[in-house]
Amino acid sequence: MLKTLLGDPNKRKLKKYQPDVVEINLLEPEMQALSDQELQSKTGEFKRQLEQGKSLDELLPEAFAVVREASRRVLGLRHFDVQLLGGMILHDGQIAEMKTGEGKTLVSTLPAYLNALTGKGVQIITVNDYLARRDAEWMGQVHRFLGLSVGLIQQSMPPQERQKNYACDITYATNSEIGFDYLRDNMATSMAEVVLRPFHYCVIDEVDSVLIDEARTPLIISGQVERPTEKYLRATAIADALQKEEHYEVDEKARNILLTDEGFIEAEKLLGVKDLFDSQDPWAHYIFNAVKAKELFIKDVNYIIRGGEIVIVDEFTGRVMPGRRWSDGLHQAIEAKEGLDIQNESQTLATITYQNLFLLYPKLAGMTGTAKTEEAEFEKIYKLEVTVVPTNRATGRRDLPDVVYKNEMAKWRAVAAECAEFHQAGRPVLVGTTSVEKSEVLSQLLNQAGIPHNLLNAKPENVERESEIVAQAGRKGAVTIATNMAGRGTDIILGGNADYMARLKVREYFMPRIVMPESDDPLAMMRIMMGDGNASGGQGFAPQGNRPQKTWKASPNIFPTKLSRETEQLLKAAVDFAVKQYGERSIPELQAEDIVAIASEKAPTEDPVVQRLREAYNQIRSEYETFTHQEHDEVVQFGGLHVIGTERHESRRVDNQLRGRAGRQGDPGSTRFFLSLEDNLLRIFGGDRVAGLMNAFRVEEDMPIESRILTGSLENAQRKVETYYYDIRKQVFEYDDVMNNQRRAIYAERRRVLEGEDLKERVLEYAERTMDDIVEAYVNPDLPPEEWDLNSMVGKVKEFVNLLADLEPQQLEDLSMAEMQMFLHEQVRIAYDRKEAEIDQLQPGLMRQAERFFILQQIDTLWREHLQAMDALRESVGLRGYGQQDPLVEYKSEGYELFLDMMTAIRRNVVYSLFQFQPQYQPPEEMPSEVV
């Protein structure tokens, strides 16, 4: 009703941008008439106009017109009008919802270029290393052509490389790299170690994945803490002995377990202890984790075992996350369950959530195919508006009604039958599954039916071929099984992706001859040591010993035809020429990937190696296109890509992402969900209603049920889950917000010290406040002065400031409280000047170094302890909800007290340490524990 009266708010927003679109289109002929050099000189011109006081908004039409023309020349891609709209929405600091295949990656070049003109840096965030590298190589060419520098951050880069790349005008990186660099920068001991520049503007690709799906997971940098291994092993044995329902209850919804009274008694009996919570010998934590590991963490669903280690599988993307570990001893409990070596537990040194990390940017924007369902959350937490960008062509996708089966096996048989039917008809099929385990069940069924298919899940042998598999998922009769949204960012083109195939063919010949052995490549060695599991786009691995040896050979059935002799000769000659120029196996892998990327595009180049490779690439592509174009037309006639969902996800948004794979850019396509009454979503959130329905439907197993009530139940369950998780995220955000204010304060203080701003004044301020604290502790203004304990007070002052050994209580006798404080301020300043002269006599400037060292040391040590105290506080206030107190209010007030105590302790410890400091390394005296 309101929409009819007021008009669609989204349309109103888009209308606002229309005049700029018209102006950019009018500028197009003028831009096309410019030479390359004239087009490139526009960048300097824009920068000068900004210096003269012009705003970015005033420059927007011409700057966008320049980028559009540069992209046409360099990449052969011209921005559609809807892509210009997307660019304006991003420049305004909003979220642009653009459907799959509408060229989101190209859209980001517009606001990135415009905002980079300020010289303050722009960061483009993608969800994995492979996409960051692909976009930096591909879209980076437009920016480089226009004279801007482009940086790329990869998982294994050393700090100097990171610094150099962050200093570029535009930097491509993943969300986790930015997050961990931010935390590491705030643990640096000198400015030379800091890699990030101040945050300015950031565009997040797949913004829903980063700001919503991953918002619940904090980023944590931790240090090792030794804990007794046998405790984990005994706890696992006890968990195995305890019975579900009788000894403990499982809350799948909250992913938690609760021991019953019988459970506590049984565990204490088996362990031979009186109390699981005994502070001298605590067991509760170990037992809870062991039961969680037994009931809630399933092999091949939540984790896989690789190389004798537990590797986490990301529940949202289905990708493995090497190097990440669950905290609080949970990872160790799972290692014990699986009989693997138990590694040390970790202690948090620094932590932040993505929510608070990205709120540090003064200007933030994002793009995704699916944001509208979470619009309220984006606006509430991030103050980000969502604007839907219309598609360039109307979609040709049909969403067919869900079919529901009584049990899971019947559902899988039906999915396999549908795959077989479409495969026979020549239509490509993409099946989305929710776990590694499920994808393998379906794969077995298809093998039994003799249907060739590609499997894409978190297993290491599949990850490396990820984009190769996705790029060919649109071939005639292709059947592809993918876990969740693996392969996000690679388009499924009907009939196959000729550009991608040609690039693979060039890599296959070029890489083995040109890439230096891993032992000579420091980046590659770092990746091996850190266990890089990111889809690097490196195809084809042949096993050799423990470490697979790279071969770069793509599977032969990828290519639609063998190359003609002339084309193969051309490719070999180009590779020989490259080897002659660079030397055999002489350049690092990332650099070689860059050469292939540039050769596969249209950017003007003076490099003879790239020119020769490009000539070969173009010829290979045109040979492949003869086949793929023909196949494209056939597949379109058959009805396009058919997408099958095999379970409703916890969020409707993830379902929509899967559906969005079909019918890109106006192609035909269809989607259907196959469900069973045993699916997690229905089981956990659909509750008893579904159980009742199961009994009501007295049907054969293989008969599908189509029912309005059931579909309603599903929608309801999804809404419930979305609300449930939104509440959790909101709670995480509210609690973390308390920590966030404290984190900002402590990191700001730390940065001032790192930059060496007025260190002496800072320490003197610490000393004066410590003197004030001592006076307040010993002097009660409500009592007559003769009752003040001046002896003890002077004793305490001397403990902190040993250079005031001559101070006598009589000197303070006739002073008021305020005068005492003033007197001690003077005394401590005199003492500090003496100390400084004494230290600087040994080595000039040593006192400043000592100040920096002690302040940083105290901040880091006490902040680490504070994080643990805040964690413990958060757990304990949770229980107060039962006592009619608001846990959040309690957490805020007590957390603030803890923070003030920490700041006081930092000040006192620094003052004490500096006055005790003896560079000849004499052992310092015992530190006084408290002012009183």
From Swiss-Prot:
Binding site residues for ATP: Q83, G101, E102, G103, K104, T105, D491
GO biological process terms, semicolon-separated: intracellular protein transmembrane transport; protein import; protein targeting; protein transport by the Sec complex
Record Pfam families: P-loop_SecA, SecA_DEAD, SecA_PP_bind, SecA_SW
CDD domains on file: DEXDc_SecA (cd17928), SF2_C_secA (cd18803)
Compartment(s) where it occurs, according to its Swiss-Prot or TrEMBL record: Cell inner membrane; Cellular thylakoid membrane; Cytoplasm
Main location (coarse class): membrane
Top-level EC class: translocase
Record text on subunit structure and interactions: Monomer and homodimer. Part of the essential Sec protein translocation apparatus which comprises SecA, SecYEG and auxiliary proteins SecDF. Other proteins may also be involved.
Role summary: Part of the Sec protein translocase complex. Interacts with the SecYEG preprotein conducting channel. Has a central role in coupling the hydrolysis of ATP to the transfer of proteins into and across the cell membrane, serving as an ATP-driven molecular motor driving the stepwise translocation of polypeptide chains across the membrane.
Descriptive protein name: Protein translocase subunit SecA
Organism whose genome encodes this protein: Cyanothece sp. (strain PCC 7425 / ATCC 29141)
